[in-house]
Amino acid sequence: MSNLENARCEACHADAPQVSDEELKELMREIPDWTPVTNDNVMMLQREFKFKNFKQALAFTNRVGDLAEEEKHHPELVTEWGKVTVTWWTHAINGLHKNDFIMAAKTDSVVDA
């Protein structure tokens, strides 16, 4: 269990700082299965999860949705047969905040729940 998994998201506003390059490297060590991606000049965290069927993929999607509601921080979720792609970023700052890394770690924790 990572330190990030046990952390709580903080309220984030438009003037909150994005993670620095140094913070990005450090935080990525705690979520090595995630990939930083850039979409429309916005850095995001993304991971694809594989499942045996649609039912398992949908159940995982719902677990991630429950986490998102608990923390009041919501991802992009693409649910397909046997696969869910989860993308985290902070809309208010158009980039990555520590909250995104916390939620990525929490997402990892519910894969086999």
UniProtKB/Swiss-Prot annotation:
Q: Does the keyword Lyase apply?
A: yes
Key words, A-Z: Lyase
Q: What is the originating organism of this protein?
A: Idiomarina loihiensis (strain ATCC BAA-735 / DSM 15497 / L2-TR)
- InterPro entries attached to this UniProt entry: PCD_sf, Pterin-4-alpha-carb_dehyd, Pterin_deHydtase
- Family annotation (NCBIfam families): PRK00823.1-1
Residues crossing the lipid bilayer are none
Q: Which GO terms describe its biological process?
A: tetrahydrobiopterin biosynthetic process
Question: What is this protein's name?
Answer: Putative pterin-4-alpha-carbinolamine dehydratase
| Keyword Lyase in record | yes
Q: Which family does it belong to?
A: Belongs to the pterin-4-alpha-carbinolamine dehydratase family.
Q: What is this enzyme's catalytic activity, as reactions?
A: (4aS,6R)-4a-hydroxy-L-erythro-5,6,7,8-tetrahydrobiopterin = (6R)-L-erythro-6,7-dihydrobiopterin + H2O
